[in-house]
Amino acid sequence: MPNETNCTLDFEQSVQLFKEYNLFITAFLLFLTIILQYGYATRTKVIYTLKMIVLWCFWPLNIAVGVISCTYPPNTGGLVVAIILTVFACLSFVGYWIQSIRLFKRCRSWWSFNPESNAVGSILLTNGQQCNFAIESVPMVLSPIIKNGVLYCEGQWLAKCEPDHLPKDIFVCTPDRRNIYRMVQKYTGDQSGNKKRFATFVYAKQSVDTGELESVATGGSSLYT
């Protein structure tokens, strides 16, 4: 009869294991803390990209752990709970991809796969350049600014442009809607009277439809040309 080996760690073994790997655990937890706390699109793009990768990895990791829990359940009750949690994780992960793909089809921006938000802002400059940015929700007003020849919106660096490059309408897309914002006010110039150095634009929400950005044309050309 083969010998059965108990792979369960006792308290002393767990303490010893923690002592051996405590430096690695500390460094790993500090890394996650920095990534999750300071990873914003308005700050460091590198840290924000790492944060997105970490968030993308969480769902597959949860599903993998759930499958292991279903394979090696502690008891019948644990098996039922593991199945429920694993199914929930799978449905949530599939739902994320469905919504992201729908949003990508509407605005053609890789920001669609941002796990932090379900909306993407888009500004088509009159020089033909398209600027997309992450946005957490659909606001009533958007206020892009130009500072020293650089366009910002929602605190994010978008492109180098002049005040005359801003269009009459800008958009915020969600998986099922396209929100259209119309320019209602424009302020140009700083204290020195330099109109190219600083400008503020106010866009108010005008209408909502189910169109895609590629249906918008400026000067007879498609948004993607």
From Swiss-Prot:
It comes from the Viruses. It is found in: Virion membrane; Host Golgi apparatus membrane. Its main location: virion. It is a multi-pass membrane protein. GO terms for cellular component: host cell Golgi membrane; membrane; viral envelope; virion membrane. Residues 42-51, 99-225 are intravirion. The chain crosses the membrane at residues 21-41, 52-72, 78-98. Keywords: Glycoprotein, Host Golgi apparatus, Host membrane, Membrane, Transmembrane, Transmembrane helix, Viral envelope protein, Viral matrix protein, Virion. It holds the Pfam family CoV_M. One of its GO terms (molecular function) is structural constituent of virion. CDD domains: gammaCoV_M. InterPro entries: GAMMA_CORONA_M, M_CoV. Residues 1-20, 73-77 are virion surface. HAMAP family: GAMMA_CORONA_M (MF_04203). Homomultimer. Interacts with envelope E protein in the budding compartment of the host cell, which is located between endoplasmic reticulum and the Golgi complex. Forms a complex with HE and S proteins. Interacts with nucleocapsid N protein. This interaction probably participates in RNA packaging into the virus. Component of the viral envelope that plays a central role in virus morphogenesis and assembly via its interactions with other viral proteins. Belongs to the gammacoronaviruses M protein family. This is Membrane protein. It comes from Avian infectious bronchitis virus (strain Beaudette US).
